[in-house]
Amino acid sequence: MKKATIALVALAFAAFTAQAQTTSANIVGYSKTSHAIGYTISAMQFDGGENGPTAVYGDQLPAGSKIYAWDGSGYSIATYGNVFVPGQGLVTKWNSEPSLAAGSSYWVETASAVDSIVSGSVNTAATVTNSIAAGYSLVSYPYPVERTIADLELSPTAGDKVYIWDGSGYSIITYGNVFVPGQGLVTQWNNPTAVVGVGQGFWYETSTPQTWVVNKPF
């Protein structure tokens, strides 16, 4: 359960080279999430190279914590706790390394309240294109920026839904006919100002496969 995701991204130039008219930079960012006891839907919005739970979270989460990575039909589950390592005995570590690659979203379960920090390189591509399958997808906005539903640049069809987890239940936003005074019925999201925070993932439900093209917002 997420008490708050702090919409904080540090944009620090880790490398900067200028020769004639050529400039290159690596932008490094981080997001901080405060987990209460229970479940959070988190998002990986940075490229950190290695992308398993050990690389992403290390020992930040308490023993007994779990990560559930959705593959479209089920979960790969990683647990942080005592694992027997030959020659070392019991070692506290993650027992598996499902991919938490940039652009992915996943559940985090914690047995006690804790803050976690996720960091890595910020995607600076002008656009990012992702495919959304029919059914339910656990997705992430590809840039570490807070967005309203209207700003996500989704390409919805009537009946599509966004599910935002608030720690105890879902806020459900539906795309369809909405009465707008002075305009009548308009096809749009019924809560376009709902917010998806930095480091926060969400469920997307659609009956039609879609291509999601996002333009860099900064």
Briefly describe each language-model feature range.
Residues A15-F218:
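N-terminal exported-region signature
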Residues M1-Q21:
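Sec-dependent, cleavable N-terminal signal peptides
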